[in-house]
Amino acid sequence: MYLGHVNMYVRNAEKSAEFYRAILGLHTYHTAPGRAVFLSANKEKSHEVALMSVGDDAPLQAKGQVGLNHMAWMVDSLDELKVLYQRLKDANVPFDHISDHGLSLGIYFRDPDGNGLEVSYELPREKWPRQDQVFASDVVNLGLFPGPWDDDPKYSRRSRLQEPAKATA
């Protein structure tokens, strides 16, 4: 099983689609003028996101309200995440936060309708730490995700990794 698509209500699907194309590089598969736009990062799929227009006066979802917290997109390399970081800065898209999760680094921001988005890079499986290291009580930054965000005030090194135990003779 895998996730097929996410269907999101937005004020104006065409306007929101411009954001998703410019910032995330998504491709439009189909547009139903005034009603919906279907987008995908994968040209082999019809859509991964369906944006449905509900009108310019529709209220925004309040933080902490029941509903979708955020939608996460993955990139294949830390370099791709660096490119996205710069694209967001160049477009003056404010960051909610940038978090080192130990296994991954995520950049969190919002679309024009306030929907939460994350783009992240995850370490290859063979580099994952053991679970007891990820959930350890000591916060240690191992520097696994160096990048332009290092000095960004929105960057939080929340990694809960510890150095691997050294073998004793």
Predicted feature residues:
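Core segments of cupin and vicinal oxygen chelate
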Residues: 9-53
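A short, polar/proline- and glycine-enriched secondary-structure boundary/capping micro-motif
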Residues: 50, 61, 128-131
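Vicinal oxygen chelate
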Residues: 2-10, 59-169
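Residue-level marker for the onset of beta-strands and adjacent loop->beta junctions
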Residues: 4, 25, 35, 69, ...
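Histidine-centered active-site/metal-ligand motif
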Residues: 5, 45-48, 70, 101
